[in-house]
Amino acid sequence: MLIPLGLSASSPAVPERPVDDTAPLENQEIPVTEKNTYPYVDIHGDYRWLWGRGQFRADSRTAPDKVRRHDERIYLTTRRLRLFPFIHFSEKTSLRTQLEDLRNDKDANADHHLYLGRLYVQHEQARLKVEAGRFNYYLLDGNVIDKKVDGLRLRLGERTTGPGSLTFFAGRTTGSDDRHRLRGWSLLYSSQHGRLKSDAAYLDFRRLQDLPSSRPSLIGQSRAGTGFDEQRIAEWRLMYELTPKLTASLDLLHAWGRHDADGYDTTDSGFVAALTYGHLDERQKGSYEAWIRYYDQPSASILYHTMDGDTTFFRRMGFCGWGARLDYIVQPGLAWAVEGFSLKNRHHTAWTGAFRETVIGTSLTAYF
C-alpha cells in the first residue's frame, strides 16, 4: 500500500485475504483437498512480490493569495509469505490460522517478521455459517472495509435460495492502539434473482479512543481536518451479469461521520460504478479478469478501503476518480496483476486546494 509519509493522516494496515469470493484472486482462499478422515491438518499458502509507485500532490492556502504546493513520490517493493494451517475437525468445523512474514525492501523498519495474523473457528452447514476469533472482514468490493477484526460473524440463509441471506457481525478492528481501533457492528442482506444480485449493508462503528483536535486548530471545523470518531454507513450494491463474462455493478453509499474534538459532523452520499470482464481460475493457464471503476466517495463512508493507495490522503474531503486492474494466470498456481488509480479530492476547503494521487503497481503471486 502506497502512503505519502508527510501527508497521510494514518497508516492503514496491509490488507489480508478476505472471505468474499468477489475479492481479487490474491486475496482469496485457494480451495484445499478434502479428506475422509478427521481430524486432519491442511497447509497452503502463497508468496507475493509487489512493486508500486505513487505520486501525491497537495495544494494548501497559507493566506488568501498564497498557495503552497507539496509534491511527494513514493516507491514500494515488498515480499510477502503467507501460510494457512487449517485443522479440520469435521466436514463442517475447522480451526483456521494464518502466519505472515512481510519484508519491505525500501524500509526495513516496516518489516513484519513471521507472526500469527489470524486465528478463528469456522462452522458451516446448509444455510448457516459461524466464524469467531480473529479473521478478515471484507465487505462486498471492499469500498467500505477490508480489515482484520476480532469478533463474531454469523450468516443465516443462502444468497441464491429462498429470501436470501442475512449476515451479522459484531467486534472490533485491530490496530496499534485504541486510537487506531474501531468497535461496532454491521448487518448485510444478500439476494439473487436470475442475473441480478443485490446487497444491502448497514455499519455502525466508533473509535475506542477519540482522536485529538486537527492541527492547525483553524482547520478542525472543516473537511480539511482528519478522521472520524463515529461513523454510520449504509451501502447498497446492485450487480448485473450482462453476459457470462461481463458484469456491471453500482455501489450506492450514504454515510454520517463525527469528530468530537473538532466539533465536526457531516452527512454525505456517493457511489462506485464498475465493469468487470473475464473470469479468473487459478488452475487454468491464460484465464484473466479485468475491471474498471469510477469512484465518487465521501470520506465518512470509508472505514478501511481495500485499494492499494491512501484514501486518508484526502482527509475529510472525500475523493473521486478512476481505478483499473488486470489479473492474469501465467500458469496454474502463478498469477500476475497490475493495478492503477488516478484520484483527486471531492471537495475543496478554505485551507486546501487540489489534492491529486496517482498510483500504479504490479505483483507476481505464487500459490502452493
Give the predicted meaning of each segment.
Residues 14-26, 30-73, 108-109, 122-126, ...:
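Outer-membrane beta-barrel pore domains
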Residues 134-163, 212-243:
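Short secondary-structure boundary segments
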Residues 7-15:
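Boundary at the C-terminal end of the N-terminal hydrophobic targeting segment
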Residues 1-6:
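Bacterial N-terminal signal peptides
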Residues 207-209:
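Flexible, surface-exposed loop/gating regions in the mature catalytic domains
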Residues 75-203, 267, 271-304:
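Outer membrane beta-barrel
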